[in-house]
Regions:
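Iron-sulfur-associated redox domains of electron-transfer enzymes in respiratory
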Residues: 1-121
Length: 121
C-alpha cells in the first residue's frame, strides 16, 4: 500500500459494524469528513452495495478504517479488486473491542490522529 503523495481528495471506507470498534470507525470517518472537507471526498460503509461503492470510488484514493482484525471493509474492497492506499485497524491503534459499547471521545480522536499520521507519512 502506498502513502498519499498528492493533494487528491480521499475516500474513506469503514467497516461500520455493530461492535464498539465498528461504531468507532464510522464516527471517526464522519468527523474527518466534517473537519476536512477539502481532503476527504466522502465516506462509504462496507455494508453498502458493491455497485454503489464501485461507482463512488471509481479509481479514487481509498483510506480504509477497519475496526478489528476481521477486516470487513478491506475484504469488501478486495471483492471489487480495489487496493486501499492506506489501511488502519482500530484495534491495532490501542482500541479494545468490547461488545456494543459506544465509542468514547478520546478513542475517536486517537483514531483520527492515526489516519492523519498515515496520510502524512
Amino acid at each position: 500500500m502506498g502513502k498519499i503523495t498528492d493533494e487528491s481528495p480521499l475516500i474513506l471506507v469503514t467497516c461500520s459494524g455493530v461492535s464498539n470498534v465498528g461504531k468507532l470507525t464510522a464516527q471517526a470517518a464522519g468527523v474527518l469528513v466534517q473537519r476536512e472537507p477539502d481532503l476527504f471526498e466522502g465516506h462509504l460503509h462496507a455494508k453498502q452495495s458493491t455497485r454503489d461503492m464501485d461507482a463512488v470510488i471509481n479509481g479514487g484514493k481509498v483510506v480504509v478504517i477497519d475496526g478489528c482484525g476481521d477486516r470487513c471493509a478491506a475484504k469488501k474492497l478486495k471483492s471489487l479488486c480495489i487496493t486501499p492506499h492506506i489501511h488502519i485497524i482500530a484495534t491495532e491503534e490501542g482500541n479494545k473491542k468490547n461488545g456494543m459499547a459506544d465509542p468514547l471521545f478520546d478513542e475517536i480522536e486517537t483514531l483520527i490522529a492515526a489516519v492523519r499520521r498515515e496520510i502524512k507519512q
